[in-house]
A protein has these predicted regions:
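N-terminal glycine/serine-rich phosphate-binding loop of ATP-dependent small-molecule kinases
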Residues: 1-86, 132-134, 139-162, 175-194, ...
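Gly-rich Lys/Arg/Thr-decorated short loops/hinges at beta-loop-alpha junctions or inter-strand turns
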Residues: 26-30, 118-137, 203-211
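Glycine-rich and small/hydrophobic secondary-structure elements
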Residues: 47, 204-220
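Short beta-strand segments
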Residues: 86-90, 126-128, 164
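N-terminal structural subdomain of ketosynthase/condensing enzymes
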Residues: 94-126
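Glycine-rich phosphate-binding loops at beta-strand->alpha-helix junctions
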Residues: 165-174
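Conserved phosphate-binding/catalytic loops in two-lobed NTP-binding clefts
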Residues: 186-209
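Conserved small/polar residues in nucleotide/adenosyl-binding loops
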Residues: 233-240
Length: 240
């Protein structure tokens, strides 16, 4: 690529519009706003990129940097269009997502409705194990309960799984063991471990974050794969 002809491209994908800005070597800007294609966001990106490159009379290979922002993950959560997601947690903590921190918008309103958790109750599986807050093993991981959890994940045909065990932020050993077993039996499943995503104290926040990450992983993976394929048609090096 000729460095003297290098350009920078910004793409921001929203639910309604996709905005593109191309910065050319001489400092001029070429902009475009196109309708987003919700079924396949990459279509609007590809169309918009082709337009700005043509208007600027530059080739895709002259784009040095692509900066991309998207609401794909946010929309998947808001619209509840994420993956069929399961949760593996410590025995006794299956209902943590509902219990939360007992904070209600209207404290004394018994009829108020709360948003449903991203993981259905039947897709939450418990394993017998326990660590204390120092990461010391109080109860070793029970392999039989772990195997039952994996069997449940397989029978429900889940696409993604969040593994969030109590006090895993202090010691990820049990989470890693569960994840290794899942990968061995179900290599196609997208896995998210709380000890990797948010290794911090406070179980509800850690579990919610891990579940949200698992919920959108397959959606984003498909989106980015499609986007990379799209970029192959405009530049010989989509990863550069």
């Amino acid at each position: 690529m000729n460095g003297e002809l290098a350009c920078r491209l910004g793409v921001d994908v929203g639910g309604t519009f996709t905005d593109l800005v191309l910065l050319t070597p001489d400092g001029s800007l070429v902009t475009r706003k196109v309708l987003s294609t919700s079924g396949n966001y990459a279509e609007a990106i590809f169309s918009g990129i082709a337009d700005v490159l043509q208007e600027a009379s530059v080739a895709g290979g002259d784009v040095k940097e692509l900066i991309h922002g998207t609401t794909v993950a946010t929309n998947a959560i808001i619209e509840r269009r994420g993956a069929r997601t399961g949760l593996v947690t410590t025995e006794g903590f299956r209902d943590l997502l509902e219990i939360g921190r007992l904070r209600l918008m209207r404290l004394y309103d018994m009829d108020q409705e709360r948003p449903a958790p991203l993981v259905r109750r039947r897709w939450r599986f418990e394993v017998a194990e326990r660590l204390n807050h120092h990461g010391e093993v109080i109860r070793p991981l029970d392999r039989d309960t772990a195997e039952r959890a994996i069997a449940g994940i397989a029978s429900e045909n889940l696409e993604a799984v969040a593994v969030c065990l109590i006090h895993a932020y202090a010691n990820p050993k049990h989470e890693q063991a569960v994840a290794a077993s899942i990968r061995q039996r179900l290599p196609q499943v997208y896995l998210t471990l709380s000890s990797e995503v948010l290794p911090e104290i406070r179980e509800f926040e850690r579990t919610s974050t891990t579940v949200a990450n698992a919920y959108v992983m397959p959606v984003l993976d498909r989106y980015l794969s499609t986007l990379e394929t799209c970029l192959l048609y405009t530049s010989p090096s989509p990863r550069d």
